[in-house]
Structures are given as C-alpha cells and as structure tokens.
C-alpha cells in the first residue's frame, strides 16, 4: 500500500511539473478518439468524414478549453445529420440545445464525461464510466453521463434508420415521429441512463465517506448495482440484455 501511495505521489509531481505539455497532448488524443468515433458511427457528410479534418479539429481543441471539444463534436453530429436531411439536423440540434440548457450548464466542470461516455461504449467498457465518474468527479457528473448515453443511443438509432431518413419519399412528419420514438420509446436507452445516474450517485456517496476502504467498497457496490439494474430493466421490458441497444432499434425497422 505504501508503494502505491508513493507511486501516486510521483505521478502527481510529474504531472504538476509538465502539466503545460501533458494537458494539450491528452486533449488532442481525446478529441481525436471522439471525432473519429462520431465519423465512424455517422459519416454521412463525406466532406468532414476525413482524417485530415479530424486532425485539424483535434489540434484546435488541444490548445483551447476542454468545453470546446464538446461543441465541436455537437457540430459534427448536426452536420452529419444535415447530410441525411434538414429535419434530422434540426431534431439533433433541438436535442443538443435541450440538454445544454437544462442539464449541461449545471455541470460545466464535469462535462467532459459526456465525451467519455460514448467512447466507453465504443470500447465495450460502459460499466467503467459511471464507476470512474463517481470516484473522480462530483455528483453533478451524472448529468453529462446521462446526456452522453442519450447521444450514444440516438446516434446508433440514426445509423440503423439512415436509409429511411434519407429517403425523399418519406414525409417529414413521419421522419420526425420516427426520431421522436427513437428517443421516447427507446427503453434500453432509458434503462442505461437510470443505471448510469444511480451508480454515479451511489459511488460518489460511498467514496466521500470517511470509513476505511471507502473506494474499494464504492467500486464493488457500483459494479454490482449497475449489473443488477441492467438485468432487471432488461427483464422488465423483455429486452435481450446482451444487445439492449439493438433489440428496440430493430423494432422500428419492421
């Protein structure tokens, strides 16, 4: 245990000494991963689905405040949505503004959690996100985490339905109804949102207590609660828990 504490202190000292160089590099890597994820899962506008565009945007984000990365990502999403249709871009923009006004403005110090959330799904480690946020951030990180889950599921929904959404013969009203249902009736998404928020609040509550092994207990409790909530939610809504984000999406294709 003493060796771990010494290693932690050395890392802190190294970081404080070279922070001016380390932070831009970390922001660049994170922005690159986030923008590549967006282009990989959307990629409808070929002009911005380009590694050189991603590199330029990531370089810009590396020298600017971290919040810029979030809004650049939003801009990419809206642009890709516009390639499918003006109604898709408009719906995406309204959804983003809704989240920014009602939720993200209260958690500005933790909003990078929104970037990490879809990446955690992309790397197939979603359980680590709420546990890590509860350990390293405050309780308000539950807001961007929940928003990140919605962004992830909505992008995956658009990916499944993009043929229908870009079809000019489909009425705009029908497309808007489809998009609305993709949010409101996506029970797999809402199960995950609730699980993320509950785990972050629980882990943060335990972690901030003064008893021994609080961190270890918080990690174990968070993992157990997450798994139980996902399984219980999947059982209640009769979803295939191994593919909870796809079961509901496929229902819209029929």
Predicted stretch roles:
Residues 61-71, 102-111, 136-142, 207-217:
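Membrane-helix interface "capping/anchor" motifs
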Residues 121, 130-239:
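Generic multipass alpha-helical transmembrane bundles of integral membrane proteins
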Residues 247-254:
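Conserved small/polar residues in nucleotide/adenosyl-binding loops
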């Amino acid at each position: 245990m003493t060796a771990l504490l010494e290693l932690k202190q050395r890392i802190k000292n190294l970081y404080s000494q070279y922070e001016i160089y380390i932070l831009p590099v970390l922001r660049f890597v994170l922005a690159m991963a986030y923008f590549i994820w967006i282009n990989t899962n959307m990629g409808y506008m070929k002009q911005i689905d380009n590694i050189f565009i991603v590199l330029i945007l990531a370089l810009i984000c590396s020298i600017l405040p971290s919040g810029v990365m979030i809004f650049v990502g939003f801009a990419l999403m809206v642009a890709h949505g516009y390639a499918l249709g003006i109604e898709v871009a408009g719906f995406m923009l309204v959804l983003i503004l809704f989240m920014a006004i009602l939720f993200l403005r209260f958690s500005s110090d933790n909003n990078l959690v929104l970037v990490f959330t879809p990446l955690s799904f992309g790397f197939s480690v979603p359980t680590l996100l709420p546990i890590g946020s509860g350990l390293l951030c405050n309780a308000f990180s539950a807001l961007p985490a929940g928003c990140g889950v919605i962004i992830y599921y909505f992008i995956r929904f658009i990916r499944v339905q993009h043929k229908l959404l870009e079809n000019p013969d489909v009425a705009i009203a029908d497309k808007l109804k489809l998009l609305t249902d993709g949010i409101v009736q996506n029970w797999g998404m809402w199960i995950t949102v609730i699980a993320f928020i509950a785990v972050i609040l629980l882990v943060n509550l335990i972690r901030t207590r003064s008893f021994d092994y609080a961190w270890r207990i918080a990690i174990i409790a968070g993992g157990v609660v997450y798994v139980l909530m996902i399984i219980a939610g999947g059982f209640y809504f009769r979803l295939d828990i191994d593919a909870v984000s796809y079961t509901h999406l496929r229902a819209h294709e029929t």
